[in-house]
Amino acid sequence: MGLPKLVCVFLFAACCCCRRAAGVPGEEKQPVPTPDLVEAEVGSTALLKCGPSRASGNFSQVDWFLIHKERQILIFRVHQGKGQREPGEYEHRLSLQDSVATLALSHVTPHDERMFLCKSKRPRLQDHYVELQVFKAPEEPTIQANVVGIHVDRQELREVATCVGRNGYPIPQVLWYKNSLPLQEEENRVHIQSSQIVESSGLYTLKSVLSARLVKEDKDAQFYCELSYRLPSGNHMKESKEVTVPVFYPAEKVWVEVEPVGLLKEGDHVTIRCLTDGNPQPHFTINKKDPSTGEMEEESTDENGLLSLEPAEKHHSGLYQCQSLDLETTITLSSDPLELLVNYVSDVQVNPTAPEVQEGESLTLTCEAESNQDLEFEWLRDKTGQLLGKGPVLQLNNVRREAGGRYLCMASVPRVPGLNRTQLVSVGIFGSPWMALKERKVWVQENAVLNLSCEASGHPQPTISWNVNGSATEWNPDPQTVVSTLNVLVTPELLETGAECTASNSLGSNTTTIVLKLVTLTTLIPDSSQTTGLSTLTVSPHTRANSTSTEKKLPQPESKGVVIVAVIVCTLVLAVLGAALYFFYKKGKLPCGRSGKQEITLPPTRKSEFVVEVKSDKLPEEMALLQGSNGDKRAPGDQGEKYIDLRH
């Protein structure tokens, strides 16, 4: 080959190399087209289309690739309209939808957020890229406040709270709020530090720590965090619960607090405590002014720093003061003195202390008491509670025996409800013993054990004796009254003689006779309310009008068993009589039902053996008292017994 030809070949080769190196317009590499964006939530199915939604063409012959590190990895083939999975991580999650142009990816995970390529074997169809974006809502955020507390005097930022949002994708955004207002980064005031952790599932766990310098006004501040995230459906957010953080600050003021609030009285349970406007509460001491020296002396308190007055008394009144010591700042504060007033009523005194008076004379009773408040006095009868008068003096004129007994003087403070004191005084009216009845009957059964009671009143206090043997017990309802109960066996001798109780004192005596009546089958007692038993009888002084003594009635002997026996016997007698009449009628000895009439002559009517005693336990309003030494006078209520005869 000649030299010219070699030169031409060399130049041609050089030109080709230069053209290849420099590039030729029209032969540049085609850029990657903008991919279609497909969004799906974790766990759902993503639909990947091989071309725009309105694109037309034959997609019966396509290949699907995964773009990974600029490499194309075949994952699925479509041949003649049928899908064929390729081995790999997507082998069991890919399938064709209704259209061969749509590839379905099931059970989407965060790892599926990649670029996919669809290549058609038809020359007219271009390569189509699909970008899959995956989303997952985080769980409800949790927040943990600083439980140790933050002191306002600290200059450095202290951790306020920590917010955690788990299992979200992509990483959510966190916002902090105080009292519903968003917090922003502020130098030397607010700092927010967030970090993320990638779980094995590909999801993110976000942790955000809020640090700040707090002030006293933040003691009740509400802090919470908010997570903002996006889903295919749009933007969303989740809020944590609100928390408060203990804020410590020194006290500026201390004061005394007393419970209960209001007027106090002796006997109340009173609690004295110290309080400040600081947090935490400092150490307290409670001092009380000594009235004799004028100095403040420390009082003994419990482990909580409380001074308990249980019960409150008069000497607890006085000036109290609190002192606080802040161990953090070593500052001592004192409260204003508080005057504690315990209202009281002193012991009540009645003069004379043991009054005695003759019947018909007058008596003056005086009541005295002391209090720091205005007093009111009231006089009452102890037994009945009857109000006799108001004022410190009670005047009794032309007294009778019924005026004897106990009187109550009550001194009260109207301004302080429940504050009062009382004193009893026993008034003695000289006189011989008196009783309600001269004679009383009681129905008994032979060989039964009977309790007989006898009551008498007088001044001096009488004594009671019995004319029969038995076990007697006594008790005194009041200084002028005595009640004696005799336990005795009912014998024929006792039925014949009865029982007598005699009350006597230095001024005379009085006697009540108890007549015992034996209950038999022929004795009926029609009204059990009049004679109510077989075991007990009470004989007591009768109460006059306006009297202050009360008659004590004990149960009387019962006769229900006897009445039942009598009814049964009568029923049996009637049954036998009816049977006899029926027998004679059947034998034809009775003219009943025949034409002949015969007169039946009855025997003469005889008096019934049944006697019913009608008794009354109620005595007249006014009854003459039985006078012992002045002669025996029958009580108006004892007018003899009334009988109703039952005849055939």
UniProtKB/Swiss-Prot annotation:
Keyword Phosphoprotein: yes
Superkingdom assignment: Eukaryota
GO terms (BP aspect): angiogenesis; cell adhesion; glomerular filtration; heterophilic cell-cell adhesion via plasma membrane cell adhesion molecules; positive regulation of cell migration; vascular wound healing
Chief site of localization: membrane
Compositionally biased spans, kind Polar residues: 532-549
Cystine bridges: 50-118, 163-225, 274-322, 367-409, 454-501
Basic and acidic residues biased stretches: 631-648
Stretches assigned to the Ig-like C2-type domain: 246-332, 337-426, 432-512
SUPFAM superfamilies in UniProt: Immunoglobulin
Cytoplasmic side: 585-648
Stored InterPro entries: CD80_C2-set, Ig-like_dom, Ig-like_dom_sf, Ig-like_fold, Ig_I-set, Ig_sub, Ig_sub2, Ig_V-set
Protein name, UniProt field: Cell surface glycoprotein MUC18
Gene assigned in the entry: Mcam
